[in-house]
Design a protein with these regions (language model features):
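N-terminal loops that bind phosphate or other acidic moieties
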Residues: 2-75
């Protein structure tokens, strides 16, 4: 299964996961979110994203999605 990492502003990613869980009647496997706040040091997120990718990687890759192209989470 391909892992999915949602990198978003605020809690948008977790809200999307919660919506999917409501529709599917179960929490999706291999899906995680990371909330990015623009007032934080963005360099710290490099390590966190690497760790999340490693935990999601099961041999088929990881799809990384952001909420707004070109915005802070996308950079």
């Amino acid at each position: 299964m391909i892992g999915i990492l949602l990198v978003t502003h605020g809690e948008i990613g977790q809200s999307l996961i919660n919506c999917a869980a409501h529709i599917l009647d179960s929490t999706p496997k291999s899906v995680e979110s990371l909330s990015i706040k623009s007032n934080n040091d963005l360099s710290k997120y490099t390590y966190i994203i690497s760790q999340k990718i490693q935990s999601l990687e099961k041999g088929n890759g990881v799809l990384i999605m952001t909420d707004i192209y070109g915005a802070t989470p996308c950079n």
